[in-house]
Amino acid sequence: FDGAYKIWGIQLDKDTFYKQKLPKEAVVHKINKKAILPTPKLVYGTATLKGKILDYQKEMMQQMKMHIESPALNVHNEQNIIKIKEDGTFQAEVKVASVTSVALELPFGWIECLIAPNEETSLIINTKELCRRQAHLQKKDKTYGEPVYFNGYLASLQQELASVDIDIVLKSVYYMDMYNDIAGKSADEYKAYVLERLPSIRKEIAQSPYSNACKELLNIQVDLAATGKIAMTERELKSAYITVNKLNKEQTDDYFYNTRIDIPTGYYDILKEFTSINTLKALYGKYYASTIYLISFLPNSLDVLKETLGTGQGPLFDNIKFNKLYQSIKDFTPLTAEQNAELKTFSSPAYAEMLTQTNKEIIKKIELNKRKTGFTVNETGQVSNEDLFPSIISKFRGHTLLVDFWATWCGPCRTANKAITPMKEELKDKDIIYLYITGETSPKGSWENMI
């Protein structure tokens, strides 16, 4: 079954085992060390990702997940499922507004790459080399080539990025260790802690043999990561205190909502060092989507960004606004007349085109949902908290129930709803009632449109 531990490619002849015939497309591109990082284009179009998995056998996994790290598509952790053909080839098309970082999830590792509108990214995935690099006993053995070969969109840069061996993670510790370290610290102490490695990382990038384009992108990724850490100051300090001191729910709520973390004047001035986050080139960064999400936890985030970056305009502000509108649409709340007017304020029509198309698709889904049958909406009535669940299920006594607690805003919940559809089809002749329960945190309008 999928996910089971399996061994492929066993070969008793050592010489035969070490022979590796690569396809002619598996080339290592020459790197131009002086190349600069090109400014990505903003245009709403189709990005194509295709490739081939070497040594693939049809009994292996027949599909893989493609995680899309777009500031829009990342809102609900959206994934594309890519079918793999019997010869190991695959192809996917995604609508995007600019360069977008994606990751392919495979049993033998994650493959990161860049896609872009009206461009094609082609991969040759060398399973033998990917597995060798992860094997404790074979890490120092002779290589079987590169783990991934890139062709098409920015192939040489993508190849170089895949080979980077600089650790640019600002604080590479288990989260509980970090919480123990920062619990009770001041904001300034937290900042010094999370940015401790920043100077040494910058120095290592500067002294590395990589191209100017690659170095620029690595520094952008450091800027994005650092911005996310600073944006999370209050939340991380509170979470650390709550976790380390093992507060119960009542104590947690009281501390989280009533405790004020003292943020010194000028605390966020450090963001002036990370101005690359407000450039189009930041869209190359694999942390871009998560950074925009983390910025949402920063109190008065737009005011802070305007003050520290010296402007209230630019790609970062466009994408924050884009993210908010996109999330509203994906929550089954079509754009209002006021929001439609707001589309004209974007610096590029690409954002408006993507939002308009997504809005049309949601309206179509809502209309289809209105025609659905085979379900009943039940009200709970006036029942005490203790009797609520027994009261709900008492209406279905004698039946097998599958109960799903979900919320309109919960990405994993909605992913799970889709995931069990094949199972429901398989069990449609069984006496099973599917009971979906949500609460007041789900806006009623969104809930009605979704069901």
Residue ranges and their predicted role:
Residues 405-422, 439, 443:
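Conserved redox-active cysteine motifs that mediate thiol-disulfide chemistry
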Residues 1-212:
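A non-transmembrane, solvent-exposed segment enriched in polar/low-complexity residues
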Residues 208, 426-430:
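Short helix-capping segments at alpha-helix termini
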Residues 114-118, 390-394, 400, 418-421:
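Sequence context surrounding c-type heme c attachment/ligation sites in exported
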Residues 429-446:
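Thiol-based oxidoreductase modules, predominantly thioredoxin-like and allied folds used
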Residues 127-399:
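Oxidative protein folding and maturation machinery
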Residues 381, 448-451:
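Short, internal strand/loop/helix patches
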Residues 391-411, 433:
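Short active-site neighborhood of thiol/selenol oxidoreductases, capturing the structured segment around
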